[in-house]
UniProtKB/Swiss-Prot annotation:
It comes from the Bacteria. Residues 74-302 form the ABC transmembrane type-1 domain. CDD domains: TM_PBP2 (cd06261). It is a multi-pass membrane protein. Residues 1-22, 99-117, 186-223, 303-315 are cytoplasmic. This is Phosphate transport system permease protein PstC. Keywords: Cell inner membrane, Cell membrane, Membrane, Phosphate transport, Transmembrane, Transmembrane helix, Transport. One of its GO terms (molecular function) is phosphate transmembrane transporter activity. It comes from Haemophilus influenzae (strain ATCC 51907 / DSM 11121 / KW20 / Rd). PROSITE patterns: ABC_TM1. The gene is pstC. Belongs to the binding-protein-dependent transport system permease family. CysTW subfamily.
Length: 315
């Protein structure tokens, strides 16, 4: 009897310890988020007091005069991420559809391995590749052609004009697109693979083409997962540092076209934080706080979109 009582006590104690330990690990996530946010606010407080809301709108970044504004890094971050998504999403969609619907079995695994290898390449390698391969190629061959043919067209001069530097927003966005394609394509492939085969077979049995099955069966059934994959790619694009630092140009000048050198929040921090002090360091911390807020807003927006889609699907 005593042995059973002791065994029951040990099981109860172990169960209680297990629950409390796992709860502590879960709570650790919130503690880390709060610690990061608090440290960013404390570090940027001097800049917040000095510049207030004007920090978000001013274009200057002058360490000598101690005048700082964040609009150029913010624009650089958003523009490069937008270019990357504009290029990466349709390509990733095509890769995922090919792997799940069209590719023969012997070809699926090699392509999947290649995608995983692309995702595993360090970002600094992408940056070096972009700097030594893409930048000269764009400067000498691609940008001059685009400027000559599109730079004078009404409505397009804002995008394809200026001097062909090679480095700049467009090159950075293109390399960033190559970097996020493996992540988006992998998630889309997994999402498409969970579509019930009966739905697709029924559509094919009614005479639907592959395009019609994709448009009318696969996409409606997986649109929630598609939004999640795009938001994953956007989060990856917003926070990229090393590759962008190599090829964006690192210029605190308001861009007048997609070919203009610029900077992003992450690249500005990486370039200047090591030698910064005083107000400049606080301004860089505020840039980090802004990036934290932007990524959080993207996450919240994605959750709201997914919730909305789930509610619509349930009706």
């Amino acid at each position: 009897m005593l042995t059973k009582s002791r065994k029951y006590f040990n099981q109860t104690w172990i169960e209680s310890l297990f629950k409390q330990t796992t709860a502590l690990f879960a709570l650790l996530v919130f503690i880390l988020l709060a610690a990061i946010l608090i440290s960013l606010v404390i570090g940027s407080w001097e800049s917040i007091k000095r510049f207030g809301g004007s920090f978000l709108l001013e274009t200057y970044w002058d360490p000598v005069q101690e005048q700082y504004g964040a609009i150029i890094p913010i624009l650089g971050t958003l523009i490069t991420a937008g270019i990357a998504l504009f290029i990466a999403v349709p390509i990733s969609f095509g890769i995922a559809i090919f792997l799940t619907e069209l590719a023969p079995n012997w070809l699926k695994r090699p392509i999947s391995i290649a995608i995983e290898m692309l995702a595993a390449i360090p970002s600094i390698i992408y940056g070096m590749w972009g700097l030594f391969v893409f930048v000269p190629l764009f400067q000498e061959h691609i940008q001059p052609v685009l400027i000559d043919n599109l730079g004078n067209l009404p409505g397009l001069e804002l995008f394809f004009s200026g001097v062909p530097f090679g480095v700049g927003l467009f090159t950075a966005g293109l390399v960033l697109a190559i970097m996020i394609i493996p992540f988006i394509a992998s998630v889309m492939r997994d999402v498409f693979s969970i579509v019930p085969p009966m739905l697709k077979e029924g559509a094919y049995g009614l005479g639907a083409t592959t395009w019609e099955v994709v448009r009318q069966v696969i996409v409606p059934h997986t649109r929630i997962g598609l939004v999640g994959s795009v938001m994953l790619g956007l989060g990856r694009a917003l926070g990229e540092t090393m590759a962008i630092t190599f090829i964006i140009g690192n210029s605190f000048q308001l861009p007048n076209s997609l070919f203009s050198p610029s900077t992003s929040i992450a690249s500005a921090i990486a370039n200047e934080f090591n030698e910064a002090g005083g107000l400049q360091k606080s301004a860089l911390m505020e840039l980090g706080l802004l990036l934290f807020v932007i990524t959080t807003m993207v996450l919240i927006l994605s959750r709201l979109m997914i919730t909305k889609m789930q509610q619509t699907k349930g009706k």
